[in-house]
């Protein structure tokens, strides 16, 4: 069975430039929306997963979903600190950080609208446990003082959080003495200060979370057994990366489901547009189809040729839409994580999986939009097609 050359199919698309551009443009818009939504969810998840270190473990109160909801009293923290699975630093001290985590309300710099921001009580050991955090402006806060440092996203996005400015919360004025960058992690959306000073100011007696590094990643199971077998403890331990990944799950799913639904609705219009274009192509090339059949090309060859034309149309739209979506990686975004009730800044992330999904989506639109017109072309008899000429 002779096949119609691909070059012939491509030339037919170029011969109808206006309809090709309009149809491919419609598909490109749908793919742009589809890819952008997937990039949004991927960026959120990547940011929160990157927040944790692979060898770090976080301990929170049993049943708590976030650090803000958690509370660990000092006796419980002291028990955990004795576990032999916790790594020690060069000075012989256990690499464990006891941290209060609180939400405060700050006005956004541009709009003045209030939003929740995480305040974390940090310790020198806590800084050592997060090597991705580095001061990029000013200096680190001094322990025992009312000094704080702000993540880059907070310093840029909220009033009073830039270096040299003052924030008032917990009945005290706090001076921003530095800005830190934590890479593409959730710490960029936090403010850090001295842990003990924050506990006193917020009149708290318990920590929100314990973070420590393991001697050996395999020691996590032993830590969990120690906690579960001790009736004095009402806490649980999780790998830090898993803990922060879980916090992104609900919002990422919501974004993905909403975006996919919108994309499917939009795709119906794009499919109809492709179908109209392909039907018009079949109608204008009736005599051509008859000639191809007279030259010995089978119905299947005609079907495949018109389907290939629709698939090429979808592929062109997919590549254009994906190219447009890729520029969204340069756009920073912040939103409320309704699982933690705090502001989080992140960026769109384009992954190979998203590229594959977007192109596959474009090809599916092309196939669905082109199948019926292609089937109509394949069903034409030689006599009827030539007579129509």
Which residues are covered by each model-predicted region?
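Mechanotransmission and gating elements of multispan inner-membrane complexes involved in transport
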Residues: 87-90, 107-114, 140, 156-260, ...
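C-terminal membrane-exit region of the final transmembrane helix in multipass inner-membrane proteins
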Residues: 3, 354-389
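Short beta-strand boundary microenvironments
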Residues: 115-157
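Short juxtamembrane loops and helix-capping segments at transmembrane helix boundaries
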Residues: 328-356
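Transmembrane alpha-helical interface segments in multi-pass membrane proteins
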Residues: 266, 279, 284-333, 357-369, ...
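Hydrophobic, regular-secondary-structure patches
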Residues: 32-118, 137-139, 144, 200, ...
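Hydrophobic alpha-helical transmembrane segments of multi-pass inner-membrane transport and secretion
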Residues: 17-44, 252-288, 311-320, 365-368
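Short, membrane-interfacial amphipathic segments enriched in basic
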Residues: 1-7
């Amino acid at each position: 069975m002779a096949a119609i050359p691909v070059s012939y199919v491509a030339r037919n698309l170029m011969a109808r430039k206006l309809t090709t551009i309009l149809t491919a443009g419609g598909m490109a818009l749908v793919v742009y929306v589809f890819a952008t939504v997937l990039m949004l969810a991927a960026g959120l998840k990547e940011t929160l997963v990157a927040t944790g270190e692979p060898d770090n473990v976080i301990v929170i109160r049993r049943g708590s979903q976030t650090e803000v909801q958690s509370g660990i009293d000092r006796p419980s923290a002291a028990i955990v600190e004795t576990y032999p699975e916790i790594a020690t630093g060069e000075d012989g001290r256990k690499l464990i950080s006891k941290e209060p985590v609180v939400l405060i309300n700050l006005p956004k710099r541009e709009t003045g609208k209030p939003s929740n921001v995480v305040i974390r009580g940090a310790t020198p050991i806590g800084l050592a446990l997060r090597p991705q955090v580095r001061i990029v402006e000013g200096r680190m806060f001094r322990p025992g003082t009312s000094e704080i440092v702000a993540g880059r996203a907070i310093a840029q996005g909220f009033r009073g959080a830039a270096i040299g400015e003052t924030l008032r919360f917990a009945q005290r004025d706090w001076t921003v003495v530095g800005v830190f960058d934590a890479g593409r992690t959730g710490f960029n959306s936090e403010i850090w200060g001295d842990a003990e000073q924050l506990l006193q100011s917020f009149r708290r007696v318990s920590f929100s979370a314990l973070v420590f590094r393991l001697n050996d990643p395999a020691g996590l199971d032993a830590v969990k057994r120690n906690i579960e077998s001790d009736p004095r403890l009402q806490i649980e331990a999780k790998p830090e990366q898993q803990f922060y990944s879980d916090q992104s799950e609900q919002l990422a799913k919501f974004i993905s489901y909403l975006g996919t639904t919108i994309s499917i609705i939009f795709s119906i219009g794009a499919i109809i547009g492709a179908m109209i274009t392909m039907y018009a192509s079949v109608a204008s090339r009736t005599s051509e189809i008859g000639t191809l059949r007279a030259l010995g090309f089978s119905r299947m060859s005609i079907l495949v040729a018109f389907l290939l034309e629709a698939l090429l149309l979808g592929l062109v739209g997919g590549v254009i839409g994906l190219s447009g979506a890729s520029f969204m990686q340069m756009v920073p975004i912040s939103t409320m994580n309704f699982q933690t009730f705090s502001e989080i800044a992140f960026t769109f992330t384009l992954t190979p999986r998203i590229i594959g999904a977007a192109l596959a989506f474009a090809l599916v639109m092309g196939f669905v939009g082109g199948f019926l017109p292609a089937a109509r072309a394949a069903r034409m008899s030689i006599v009827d097609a030539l007579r129509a000429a």
